[in-house]
A protein has these predicted regions:
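Glycine-rich phosphate/pyrophosphate-handling loop used in enzymes and phosphotransfer proteins
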Residues: 1-191
Length: 191
């Protein structure tokens, strides 16, 4: 299985900036039906060509956002144990490791899933926020410095990124000086 020529032609990274509360979100693509198919091909089918498109899009955004590389760390959104077993990998963590190796930007795999959540598809924005609240926590013994850049495949409502930012700052102080996010795709408008 591979990515069709038509989908590859439509996959042209741009630069979109969105705000979720105080969280700056930088994205490469609008979340279109084609983008959805590419994300699913990577996430659920492990298609290397789709992985490469997502990696390239995220690197494009990291370059466009003009973020100072020496001052931030990439923080991947974690997958549940169930998703890891089903996919045979830690999807976003694996993509982020490749991005880190390609760019030389540091990575901190410091978030973990701390409780089971319901499937997000079909939930409203408010339901997604409620569903995700308390779903992530910091791994013990993690030392955090500088600025954090959360990495995810897509932002639709912002519930996952909100929760990840909450978990990063859950120690009663800002663990990182600032938290932003970079995603391959963004839903416009956020749902």
């Amino acid at each position: 299985m591979s990515i069709c020529t038509s989908c590859r032609r439509e996959w042209i990274p741009h630069y979109y900036r969105t705000y979720i509360d105080a969280l700056n979100v930088h994205s490469a693509m609008l979340y279109t039906p084609t983008a959805s198919r590419i994300i699913l091909a990577a996430k659920e089918n492990g298609l290397r060509g789709a992985d490469d498109l997502l990696i390239t899009a995220i690197i494009h955004v990291l370059n466009k956002a003009r973020l100072e590389r020496g001052y931030f760390t990439l923080v991947p959104i974690p997958s549940s144990k169930q998703s890891q077993r089903r996919r045979g990998r830690r999807f976003i963590v694996d993509l982020t490791k490749t991005i880190s190796q390609t760019t030389g930007i540091g990575i901190s795999d410091c978030l973990q899933v701390s409780r089971q959540v319901s499937d997000q598809s079909g939930l409203t924005k408010a339901q997604r926020i409620s569903n995700m609240h308390g779903a992530f926590s910091l791994k013990s013994g993690v030392i955090l410095r500088g600025d954090a850049i959360l990495i995810d495949d897509v932002v639709t409502t912002g519930a996952t990124l909100r929760e990840a930012a909450r978990a990063l700052n859950s120690q009663g102080f800002l663990a990182f000086r600032s938290v932003s996010a970079v995603t391959a795709c963004v839903s416009q408008p956020l749902r």
